Amino acid sequence: MSELSFMEKLLDGAEVEWKALEEVCDFKNGFAFKSSLFKESGLPIVRITNVDGKNINLSDVKYFDPSDYRENTASYKVCKGDILIAMSGATTGKIGFYSHENPAYLNQRVGKFLPKLETLNNRYLYHYLLSKVEKIYVIAGGGAQPNLSSSALMEKIKIPVPFPDNPAKSLEIQAEIVRILDTFTELTAELTAELSLRKKQYNHYRDQLLSFEEGEVEWKKLDEVSKKISSGGTPRTGISEYYDGSIPWLRTQEIDFREIWDTGVKITEAGLKNSSAKWIPENCVIVAMYGATVGKVGINKISMATNQACANIDLDDRVVNYRYVFHYLTSEYEYIKSLGTGSQTNINAQIVKSLKVPIPYANDPEKSLAEQARIVTILDKFDTLTTSISEGLPREIELRQKQYEYYRDLLLSFPKSEKRGSLI
């Protein structure tokens, strides 16, 4: 069946009315729980950081004790099936579906949608809101400090209601659209769960393969097994001649335990010459020294330049396999991160140079490299399965997500006009 005939059969001459959210839905703002009264146990609080764009993630949750407050917090309860939205900060506009059995409570700057169920299917609203995240962000003002007003949100976002004069028929159509879209989200959820399991397996085998008894290996500093360890630089911003060139220029936010085949920013020859940025060869192991990604590692698969926050390790292939070092430093992420100093917990080039790696059979380079290669072969299989965007589970998840978004936009793209009109 073609896409058009499918839509025609599903909608079958339906009329649609675009209604402001405030017409078909109520909204509840969160309560101002005091961070000074947060507990490590008690009743959970949903904060903006728990809204991940699809679900409510309670892996990092704070708690409260109701006896600490004079106010009655019962009306701020979040139950299974509730739809929440982040109202400010980096997650502004992100939607989260609460799927947990036990209730939680709504913190300030998190809002809860309360659809009028005689008119609007809860999951229909959820899928529609997922398609409007960018528009909601614009309503919030965008920029560095977005801040979403609940009144503006409820007034400016309009949702299509098919058969508005026939609630039963309308809900039937909405339920069918939900059934189709939920099929795709369930497939993605299954793949994501599989990916999580495979990552745990990778971590287990990595830790087993890279754990050595005393005397089995020789521990050497990175600067002992490298040709060169360098950092880069940043061409002066505001000088247009330095940017939008052809030289890949890596920033630390692009380092995430995987191969790096391209960069988000390119610089020019002039930018390279007039800064501390410099070319590095392919297959360096790169460690992020500053910022949110400090301690993360990656491998550049093309020659590129980097900023000054990258420690670029050009390893001596007569002594070590670069992917062996990559896997080992990945396993040491938490330790490397703990070496940071200052409010930003940064590390420096000297810390990176002094990091030690275990070299098996250090007195027999040929045997040592063979053992490293054996370990790498095993770990690379798991790494490909869990991180590759061209194959493996991440690729499959990406394809399923694109498929979901395609059908979501197809099913929810009703013709829009000022007046109610026929869809066919």
Would you name each region that the model predicts?
Residues 1-424:
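Charged, alpha-helix-forming regions
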